[in-house]
Amino acid sequence: MISIFWTQLASEDLQEVYDYISRDSIQYADRFVDNLFERVDTLEKFPRLGRVVPEFASESLRELIYGNYRLVYEIISETEIHMIRVHHSARLLK
């Protein structure tokens, strides 16, 4: 089974998204994050589910789309994935 690790940057991104959504509704923010984690957990069985990030064209750097967010991750090995960013799709990815 594949282990999924969250980088500090991805964790900070997720916290910012949660904080933003929770200004309107803590309940919706909780649900959003729970559903996001469920989406990420699908990578344990299907690590190549996401598309290659077009800006970088590296086979190991991929993304899942969740709502308006790009969940950018890197396949480190057959047993390890790192979540790199939780990035709003309207913003440029650097």
Predicted segments — roles?
Residues 66-94:
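Enriched for short, Lys/Arg-rich terminal
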Residues 1-60:
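Basic, Lys/Arg-enriched alpha-helical interface segments
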Residues 62-64:
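Short acidic-hydrophobic surface loop/beta-edge motif
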